A protein has these predicted regions:
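Alpha-helical membrane insertion/targeting regions
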Residues: 1-154
Length: 154
């Protein structure tokens, strides 16, 4: 699907920005898969499994939150990114990512109140999630990432 989106955007004249922005959905998928795999490996440890599944779920919120943010900022009649309109700058992904992370913050606050501190899974996996969200901004514009997208689009 990402390869099709890149090709569609390139036909509309937005190839570079589409290639750069494609790091967002791909890192979301990879982080989700890795977190779910870790959760499945810890199924016999319910406290770890549950929290990894929460972090995995939070990692998927970015696209939904981005649609709401775009609707608020651009209005209802504006053309949607990825549907013939220019893809947004990659830095735009930070706002919906961090807004989605508020669900994780709420879970950490719940742990803090119930256990006296947040569970280490929330701290470690949450920090990894934020690192991925922040690092994809500079990495998306690199020649190495664009080479990956060329391979994906084939």
């Amino acid at each position: 699907v990402t390869g099709q989106a890149i090709e569609s955007a390139s036909l509309a004249g937005f190839e570079q920005r589409a290639r750069t922005f494609s790091i967002v959905p791909i890192t979301i998928i990879l982080f989700f898969a890795g977190t779910v795999a870790a959760a499945l490996a810890n199924v016999r440890r319910p406290d770890v499994h549950m929290r990894l599944m929460v972090v995995a779920s939070v990692s998927l919120l970015t696209p939904a939150v981005a649609r709401l943010v775009f609707l608020v900022l651009a209005g209802e009649g504006a053309p949607r990114p990825g549907m013939g309109a220019e893809p947004p700058p990659i830095a735009f992904s930070l706002l919906p990512s961090f807004l989605g992370n508020l669900v994780l913050v709420a879970a950490m606050v719940h742990d803090w109140r119930a256990r006296g501190r947040p569970h280490r899974v929330y701290v470690i996996a949450g920090a990894a999630l934020v690192a991925v969200q922040v690092l994809r901004v500079p990495l998306g514009a690199t020649a190495a990432w664009h080479a990956v997208t060329m391979w994906l689009a084939k």
